[in-house]
From Swiss-Prot:
Catalyzes the transfer of endogenously produced octanoic acid from octanoyl-acyl-carrier-protein onto the lipoyl domains of lipoate-dependent enzymes. Lipoyl-ACP can also act as a substrate although octanoyl-ACP is likely to be the physiological substrate. Substrate binds at residues 77-84, 144-146, 157-159. GO terms for cellular component: cytoplasm. InterPro entries: aa-tRNA-synth_II/BPL/LPL (IPR045864), BPL_LPL_catalytic (IPR004143), Octanoyltransferase (IPR000544), Octanoyltransferase_CS (IPR020605). It catalyses: octanoyl-[ACP] + L-lysyl-[protein] = N(6)-octanoyl-L-lysyl-[protein] + holo-[ACP] + H(+). Its main location: cytoplasm. One of its GO terms (biological process) is protein modification process. The gene is lipB. The record marks 141 as: Lowers pKa of active site Cys. HAMAP family: LipB. This is Octanoyltransferase. The active site is at 175 (acyl-thioester intermediate). Keywords: Acyltransferase, Cytoplasm, Transferase. It is found in: Cytoplasm.
Length: 216
């Protein structure tokens, strides 16, 4: 496969989910209009918020929306409710799957493989689970995946817990999985930091999708 150009954005600051989601949608629409436009990758952290997929069950929010102290967004992706916060690294991929494989199951499994390679770079043994989407360390979930797709142009992506406040997941039923335990990478490798993980995420995506990155 020939290399494809992708714009990559890696802010150092903690970013608003609303602003980054709007940016993704803009790149998605640009690719739909003209697939010669570059793909778009965003790697960073969010302020504390909760997001629900298109068909999410609000019963999986364990707090009232009427007096919520947190931002809650319903967005264009599959899957159930999840949480974003500082200390968790989020990666969004706005890709034209027509250049790769027009198969969403292939894409989900590809993302799982990418996450497993990222954690493997830090000597963390992890795995996918049959019947579920995401990546686990033993019986604890370390990474969540949620994607949207319109005319084969993807949106959203995956999150990896690096060193975040896992208590925030207690306010939801994560990914709709009852009694789901969550994990942080830092608990399995004390020497890592989020900037180093970010570097490996970029490198792995670049290699797996044959991208030539343009920083922006």
């Amino acid at each position: 496969m020939d290399n494809r150009t992708a714009i990559i954005k890696q802010p150092d600051n903690i970013s608003s989910f609303h602003d980054v989601y709007k940016l993704q949608k803009e790149y998605q629409e640009a690719l739909i209009l003209d697939n010669s436009n570059p793909d778009f990758i965003w790697i960073g952290e969010h302020q504390l918020c909760y997001t629900l997929g298109r068909g999410s069950n609000y019963d999986n929010l364990l707090f009232s929306l009427n007096d919520a102290k947190y931002d809650v967004f319903k967005i264009d992706r599959g899957g159930e409710v999840t949480c974003h916060m500082p200390g968790q690294l989020v990666t969004y991929l706005v890709l034209d799957l027509k250049n790769f494989n027009k198969d969403l199951n292939w894409y989900l499994r590809k993302i799982e493989e990418i996450i497993i390679k990222i954690l493997g770079a830090f000597n963390i043994d992890c795995h996918s689970r049959k019947g579920f989407t995401g990546v686990w360390i033993g019986n604890k979930k370390i990474a969540s995946i949620g994607i949207g797709c319109k005319k084969w142009i993807t949106i959203n992506g995956f999150s990896i817990n690096i060193d975040c406040e896992l208590e925030n997941f207690n306010k939801i039923v994560p990914c709709g999985i009852e009694n789901c335990l969550m994990a942080n990478m830092i608990d399995y490798n004390k020497n890592l930091n989020i900037q180093e993980v970010k570097r490996i995420v970029k490198k792995t995506i670049e290699e797996e999708f044959n991208f030539d990155f343009i920083s922006k």
